């Protein structure tokens, strides 16, 4: 298990495919990330209202609410949320919508864990910088 910034990064994986959720969870936890899963966009929104996550990785094509709609709703809740989308071949228009809507990156299925880990390393660095900036701002706002 890694003990870098990974161990502080919390990730929500959203996919209606149980195998994808399980493989991502196991792979990312092995690298030291804290991982939760949701099997639908609706479950993801409920989870995000109860818990804090640095990153959401979501499938684009899901049941009643797709990943594009989920991304837009999450961005309304938290504009700084780092969202990554997963797609199967042939969903390029949806990927473009997600990137225009604020997704940080996209991963094509079949997934390559190495690509995801590279993006999450960048996400961890961003989260650390934002946390540091927020802490400094909070201290200066309180006169310390």
Question: Which residues make up each language-model segment?
Answer:
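Acidic catalytic/metal-coordinating carboxylates
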Residues: 39-43, 65-69
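The feature encodes the CheY-like receiver
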Residues: 21, 63-64, 87, 91
